[in-house]
């Protein structure tokens, strides 16, 4: 069993009174510093949480995890985890330092620099794809027209084609973050069917839809769109680890989507909680719930998601 969507780094944050909500912390985490490089003035650090991850892997019989960086998590720390446990971990490469330099005002964002950073990390052992998702200039606040955005995405697809690796394409979103959501800025985050254009242009590059269109909440429109693309290309893959049992039927019952296009990718290490509403549809789903605040514990993604797989298996007599 392989978990294809795992955040094995964790943040420690110094916050003031009233600052501990999703919106404030999301911005603070983007420039996080590795714990070993921090000093007394550092407000946010990321640290290796792989000991907890390995414990969960043993508990739930998970054989390998794909490590992803997000919110200031670094390629460097993922590489250290791979070197310590090469039989357990591989990782996706992201232009983390290019983004941080832009956020700190040290160097303007450029897609050429982002592509160079991706190329550097994909040249190292253990880095097997790009992602999570395809971001962009972190200082931008106005929407990007698709014609312009498509040119940007080609930088990532060119590097992926050179290295023979998949590109991860983000689909779905959580509630709770303040300011401009990425799906407001980027048309490809708004409409996953645009991936078909890049897939046709780069037939040799597989695409993995992060979250399979269902990162959080109960809205299924992104799921419908990603299954449309996966039904057209046999090397487009869907992560269904956050699906509830009934939702799994959509891709599994589609005769144009093969079972090997479905990946068990949840969001291990993220801050969503499982919302339960018995006798409603869906009976349970993942979400960030602002009124309840940040969870005081690390949510158990695998136990809950394996139960949904078991529910589907029992319902369909597998």
Regions found by a protein language model. Name each.
Residues 5, 57, 121, 160, ...:
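Conserved, mostly hydrophobic/aromatic
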Residues 46-52, 74-76, 108-116, 149-153, ...:
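Well-ordered, non-membrane alpha-helical segments in soluble/globular domains
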Residues 143-264:
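Catalytic pocket-lining loop regions of alpha/beta-barrel enzymes
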Residues 43-47, 67-76, 98-112, 138-147, ...:
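Acidic-and-aromatic substrate-binding clefts and catalytic sites of carbohydrate-active enzymes
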Residues 2-4, 67-68, 92-94, 131, ...:
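Active-site neighborhood of phospho(di)ester-bond hydrolases with catalytic His/Asp-centered motifs
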Residues 64, 72-178, 236-237:
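Active-site gating/metal-coordination segments in enzymes
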Residues 5-11, 170, 211:
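Histidine-centered divalent metal-coordination motifs
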Residues 2-4, 11-64, 256-261, 271-318:
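Mid-to-C-terminal alpha-helical segments outside catalytic/metal-binding sites
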């Amino acid at each position: 069993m392989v978990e294809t969507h795992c955040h094995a780094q964790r943040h420690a944050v110094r916050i003031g009174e009233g600052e501990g909500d999703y919106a404030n912390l999301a911005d603070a985490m983007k420039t996080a510093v590795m714990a070993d490089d921090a000093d007394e003035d550092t407000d946010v650090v990321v640290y290796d949480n792989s000991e907890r991850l390995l414990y969960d892997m043993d508990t739930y019989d998970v054989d390998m995890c794909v490590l992803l960086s997000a919110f200031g998590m670094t390629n460097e720390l993922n590489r250290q985890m791979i070197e310590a446990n090469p039989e357990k971990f591989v990782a996706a490469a992201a232009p983390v330092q290019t983004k941080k330099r832009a956020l700190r005002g040290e160097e303007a964002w450029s897609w050429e620099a982002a592509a160079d950073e991706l190329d550097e990390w994909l040249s190292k052992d253990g880095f097997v794809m790009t992602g999570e998702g395809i971001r962009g200039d972190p200082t931008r606040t106005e929407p990007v027209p698709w014609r312009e955005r498509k040119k940007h995405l080609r930088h990532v697809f060119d590097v992926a084609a050179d290295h023979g690796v998949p590109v991860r394409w983000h689909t779905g979103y959580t509630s709770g973050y303040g300011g401009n959501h990425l799906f407001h800025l980027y048309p490809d985050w708004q409409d996953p069917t645009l991936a078909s254009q890049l897939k046709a242009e780069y037939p040799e590059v597989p695409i993995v839809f992060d979250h399979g269109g269902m990162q959080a909440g109960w809205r299924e429109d992104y799921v419908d769109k990603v299954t449309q693309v996966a039904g057209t290309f046999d090397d487009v893959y869907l992560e269904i680890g956050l699906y509830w049992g009934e939702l799994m039927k959509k891709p599994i019952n589609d005769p144009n989507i093969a079972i090997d296009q479905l990946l068990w990718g949840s969001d291990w290490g993220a801050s969503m909680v499982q919302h339960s509403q018995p006798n409603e549809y869906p009976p349970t789903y993942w979400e960030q719930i602002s009124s309840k605040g940040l969870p005081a514990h690390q949510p158990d993604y695998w136990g809950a998601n394996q139960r949904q797989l078991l529910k589907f298996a029992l319902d369909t007599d597998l």
